[in-house]
Amino acid sequence: MEEVIKVSNLTRKYKDFSLGPVDLSFPKGFATALIGANGAGKTTLMDIICGITAKTDGTVTYFGETDNADKGNVKERIGYCASQAMFPANWKVRDIALSMSLAFDKFSKDRFYSLLGELGVTDEKNSKKPLSSMSDGMKMRVFLASAFARDTDLLVLDEPGSSLDPLMRDRLCDRFRDYIDSGNGERSIIFSTHNIADMENAADYVIFMDNGKVIEQGFTEDLKDKYIALSAEPESLDKISPLLLCSSHSSSTATGLALAENKLKLEALGAVTERPTLSQLSIDLMKIAEEKRDRKSVV
């Protein structure tokens, strides 16, 4: 697998949180989703990749060539979109267009305004508002337009769908696909989310994080083949529980996650199995990680 970014033995230590050590390869030519609960370390990892936050140890290799995010050619090739304030609060759309055109050689004002139109920020009322007067969703549309208006090889987007309505998230997924397809295998996206439900179709590769660690990763279809979601009668839980990675139950049904290699055994014990969605996988993998932490804290 050819990678666009390679992370080796990466750590970042704070007083109350530690990222890593993380070893990852982000595949070139695909959209990779970083999935995890709030505080899992997604933003820290992305900020290190973009040179915004310093790492404590380890290396990040960009485009198979360099480990320096501050090099001019690397900065020109990476577009970044934060989930929080990217520009001064009193700036308007025209200020952002001017700033981006001065900062980056391959920023297109025409493209920027065209994207704003696609994302519904074209009317005079919105375009003349300062960022401080815009809703979170409207600000995110402006931030995304500023990132997509650059001619880059990699987009790094922190929680791009979190403040968007379902229609805009759907349009964003289309924009992801257009960006990837236009690169003929040379363009990649890394985006983070704590809720993949509305953006599942945008993720070719997924990395699940919990408490600063990577707990699972792989191409989306491969992971869906690796695991199975299941449901069963509650009275069957004792029989099938040894084969389950996690489970939950109510008075009427029991559900859980298992490895696909145990599919026939589980069905023979009365369970109904199906291919999991990424949303199901993310919830269950986070449950498994939480249960492991709880067991360690007891010990």
For each feature predicted by the language model, list its residue ranges:
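Helix-to-loop junction immediately C-terminal to a conserved catalytic motif
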Residues: 50
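Conserved ABC transporter NBD signature motif
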Residues: 58-69, 73-74
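Catalytic Walker B motif of ABC-type/P-loop ATPase nucleotide-binding domains
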Residues: 155-159
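ABC-family P-loop ATPase nucleotide-binding domains
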Residues: 82-142
